[in-house]
Amino acid sequence: MEFTKVVAERYSCKNFSTRKVEAEKLTEILEAGRLAPTAKNSQEQRIYVLQSEESLAKLDKVTPCRYGAPTCLVVAFDKNSVFTYPGGKRDSGMEDAAIVATHLMLAAANAGVDSCWLNFFDPDELAKELGLPENEEVLMILDLGYAAELSLIHISEPTRPEPIS
């Protein structure tokens, strides 16, 4: 799909069917995350694929926002591998993970897979529930799947400024 069309047509799906994301599409989505740029090419991102009933139940304990998605990606980063910016006040972890997550989300749209970016959860609680190492910090969850047939797709009117001239 043409990039501006992907960006314009992507929306946050909040009612998923039980249809599974095909393995080849999931691989394509994950590859986009792997190829995402990171500061100094540190590649500190960690992407956890949750698909089993057990892992999705753990997710459901910490957020009401899975919306029935059959696949969820948890995007985290290794705090020990981040690039620290001059002055030592900030590091690349959160922004690199956000770049990776954005690549995943747009690759999903390009593959015809619906998604929803989730931040409504306690990252420490989720890390504990999933048994993640202490050096990893969770940024977000990306719900993946296909919209339920009867779901109402709400596409908001753009609130962005007029196009740049």
Give the label of every model feature segment.
Residues 25-31, 35-100:
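Glycine/small-residue-rich phosphate/adenosyl-binding loop
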Residues 100-109:
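Acidic, metal-associated active-site segment
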Residues 112:
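Structured binding elements
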Residues 115-119:
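Short beta-strand segments at enzyme active-site cores
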